[in-house]
Amino acid sequence: MNPSAENSARVVATQEGDSPRQLTAPLTFFFAAAVGVIVMNLFAAQPLTAAIGRSLHLAPGLAGLVAMLAQLGYAAGLVLLVPLCDLLENRRLIVQTLTGCAGFLAIAMFADSRGVFLVAVFLAGATSSVIQMLVPMAASMAAESHRGRAVGNVMSGLMLGILLSRPTASVIAGAIGWRAFYGVAAAIDALLAVVLYVNLPVRRPLVVTRYPALLRSLWTLLRTEPVLQRNAASAALVMGAFSAFWTAIGLRLAQPPFSFDMNRIALFALAGAAGAIVTPLAGRAGDRGAGRKALIAGHLTMLIALAAIGAAGADWGGFSTGAHPALAVALLVAGAAALDAGVVTDQTLGRRAINLMNPAARGRLNGLFVGVFFVGGALGAMFSGAAWSLAGWSGVCAVGFVFTSVAFGLRLIGVVRGTEV
């Protein structure tokens, strides 16, 4: 870490844990399941906006805020809450943040007022940033030689949670109403808080600083840390491609010749989630010194996947979707899984690099990394919507190609310069 970055928060030392505990296989699985469940708070509202809007008498414009507010809250939590990992005892911080999240979800479930509901959704999103406290906690509990594998295993839960959040919310809301989803989420988060309190070690960062100085150090870290810059930029670009695809795929599947209803689109999302299985493999590749090759392979896989997706949805390369609809669906499923695999490879290896940096700034580094790729995802969704309106599915695939090609180019430049691990 650059001295200026370290001095900006006047970090003296970091005590990894007063009660050392190794990251066992069952505990790794629990971490993965926990982040997978919590991340659903951010994306599950998207298929529920219409039902919520009708129930709370929200205008169409305000109904769209439901999904956006959760993610805006998450972004605020990354900046304001996650850096506290470098200042406060981590177990207590994680448990209290997750307990708060459960409380805000419960308020959202019972809210009859539009204002109360929207504020509760925002605060639930902010406290869902506890995910980015759990990932560095898991990394700190793993031996350095296995840190990539540990991060990869936890990230697999995160990616599965993102992909499964929409169909899960649709199923729960369809069976017992949208309020039930928030109730179930609140109960699960409260239970997770209890289990985490029992299983997490005490970890006290020993710092001499104040909260405002800690926040000011975020900009210094982002400006001076090349490892953070490279990995966050690449993660943002591939997340942009990922978001562009998943933002528009439901629109394409609803069109002929597919004409999928909501249930079939949910099943498609489940099938596409298969790409997350490569996450622990990517982490192991990084631990074995093959991270550079895995990154290049991941980006090439994404480019090939986008070509297949373009052929299946927009008749690229002379393929006829109308003449071969079943084959087109198979190509879309395979392409979605391959695209997801490339994204999680990049993010897992990026996470590994971030968590091998100075432990005293691990919370801030993780918060910045996620914040930057979160911006990439938002840009991908925005460009996807515009591309769909202007050029249909071909435009969406072109957006994915541009994002992925730039990420691939940046990684190749890093290989040539010898800066890639």
Where are these regions (language model features)?
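Conserved MFS/SLC helix-loop-helix module at the cytosolic interface between two early adjacent transmembrane helices
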Residues: 76-114
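Helix-to-loop junctions at the C-terminal end of transmembrane segments
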Residues: 77-89, 277-291, 388
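Cytoplasmic helix-loop-helix junction between adjacent transmembrane helices
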Residues: 121-157
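Helix-loop-helix hairpin linking two adjacent transmembrane segments in secondary transporters
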Residues: 146, 153-200
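Juxtamembrane intracellular "pre-TM" segments in multi-pass secondary transporters
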Residues: 12-22, 200-232
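Intracellular juxtamembrane helix-capping segments at the cytosolic ends
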Residues: 130-142, 344-358
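Structural signature of the two symmetry-related core transmembrane helices
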Residues: 93-106, 186, 293-308, 401
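C-terminal transmembrane helical hairpin of 12-TM major facilitator-type secondary transporters
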Residues: 293-346
